[in-house]
Regions:
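Acidic, low-complexity cytosolic segments
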Residues: 2-29, 38-148
Length: 148
């Protein structure tokens, strides 16, 4: 089983197992990833390579950030986003909030049943509860920049 930030822990192994179960129960679902609000991958299904998981985490965090901006400007002012969905040629990206500071992203085939994917994701988020909490990274001050 492949995990994100702390390989080998029981929680991460259980989370990976639950993500894999989501794929098995959801026809057309191809990949699943748990990420932090700031785009760090926390856990992924084995079908995603490390590089793909990094890229998907960055994409999903960016989409969620933009969605929060749209909600703050054009929604009820709370800035809350329940979910985001992006259809592209060859697939659909679903993103839902999943605990404090965490998101669940799923890539599905373009002919997948969006309602079923969303429902399965919601069930998983409810099931996971505390497992999907991801506190924001602390600001450790200025970061070193690479020499030119």
């Amino acid at each position: 089983m492949t995990t994100g930030t702390t390989p080998g822990t029981t929680t991460d192994a259980k989370l990976t197992w639950l993500l894999q179960g989501l794929l098995e129960r959801t026809p057309g679902a191809r990949h699943a990833l748990v990420l932090s609000r700031d785009g760090l991958k926390l856990c992924r299904t084995p079908e995603l390579s490390v590089d793909q998981a990094d890229q998907l985490a960055a994409i999903a965090a960016g989409i969620q950030s933009l969605s929060h901006g749209a909600s703050a400007e054009f929604g009820d002012g709370s800035g809350g986003v329940r979910s985001a969905m992006t259809e592209f040629y060859g697939g659909i990206l679903f993103i839902v909030e999943a605990g404090e500071g965490a998101h669940l992203a799923v890539i599905a085939a373009e002919d997948a049943d969006a309602g079923l994917v969303g429902h399965t994701m919601s069930e998983l988020v409810e099931q996971l509860g505390e497992h999907l909490r991801a506190a924001p990274r602390a600001d450790d001050g200025p970061r070193a920049t690479p020499a030119s």
